[in-house]
A protein has these predicted regions:
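Gram-negative (and chloroplast) outer-membrane scaffold detector with strong preference
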Residues: 51-128, 186
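Flexible, solvent-exposed coil segments and beta strand-coil junctions
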Residues: 32-39, 79-83, 120-126, 161-166
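Predominantly the C-terminal beta-signal and adjacent terminal strand-loop region
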Residues: 32, 145-189
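Extracellular loop and loop/strand-boundary signature of outer-membrane beta-barrel proteins
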Residues: 42-43, 84-90, 126-132, 167-172
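Membrane-embedded beta-strand positions of outer-membrane beta-barrel proteins
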Residues: 33-39, 69-73, 100, 116-120, ...
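Cleavable N-terminal export/targeting peptides
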Residues: 1-30
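Short glycine/proline- and aromatic-enriched beta-strand/turn motifs that initiate or cap beta-hairpins
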Residues: 21-75, 182-189
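Residues that define the transmembrane beta-barrel architecture of outer-membrane proteins
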Residues: 31, 47-53, 92-98, 134-140, ...
């Protein structure tokens, strides 16, 4: 267990060093902020009843060939329970971690745009989550979004997201799926 923890801490340290050693131009060019708030309800897994309340804050980092690449942070508050082995176990926690998103956007008409988003977050939880899991994990999201650009610098969006959360390990990996609506606001400076 100590070896796994030391490897985990080493990987996090190397990621932080890599991010902060980037040339300033790489992370100083973003001139916008996007906030997404969502409620995702549990689905698919029969023994995992966990709902997610998420806040994502993104900045556009790069644009290429119709795709935009974003970096940000995710705060999540999953709540619920699991019933593995017919034993009810509470699965409430708070998670925080870095996120990245890829968005493909196409105009529909006038100020209305259609988007397809894929994002991933690496989260550190306040305790082992879900029950019998680990205190860290990943959250993957995919879904369509409609964006209304009501001014040159502001837009409002509504999306429907599918989310998969797990820690990616073969053992102690009680992952769960959820679906739900996401509301977003973007402001360009």
């Amino acid at each position: 267990m100590k070896r796994k923890l030391s490897v985990f801490v080493s990987v996090i340290f190397l990621l932080v060093v890599a991010v902060f050693s980037l040339p300033q131009g790489c992370y100083a060019m973003a001139k916008n902020a996007e906030v997404q708030v969502e409620y995702l309800r549990h689905r698919i897994y029969a023994r995992r009843f966990i709902d997610n309340y998420n806040i994502h804050v993104f900045q556009k980092a790069h644009e290429h060939a119709g795709l935009t690449f974003h970096r940000g942070i995710t705060v999540t508050r999953p709540r619920g329970y699991t019933t593995e082995d017919n034993i009810r176990r509470d699965s409430d926690a708070v998670g925080l971690g870095p996120a990245c998103m890829i968005r493909w956007e196409r105009p529909i008409s006038g100020k209305l745009y259609g988007d397809l988003e894929f994002s991933g977050s690496f989260l550190i939880y306040s305790k082992a989550f879900p029950a019998q899991g680990r205190p860290w994990g990943f959250m993957w999201r995919l879904g369509p979004r409609l964006t209304w650009k009501y001014t040159k610098n502001n837009s409002f969006s509504l999306g429907y997201m599918f989310s998969h959360s797990s820690n990616g390990m073969r053992t102690n990996n009680p992952g769960h799926h959820s679906f739900g609506f996401s509301i977003g606001f973007n402001h360009n400076f």
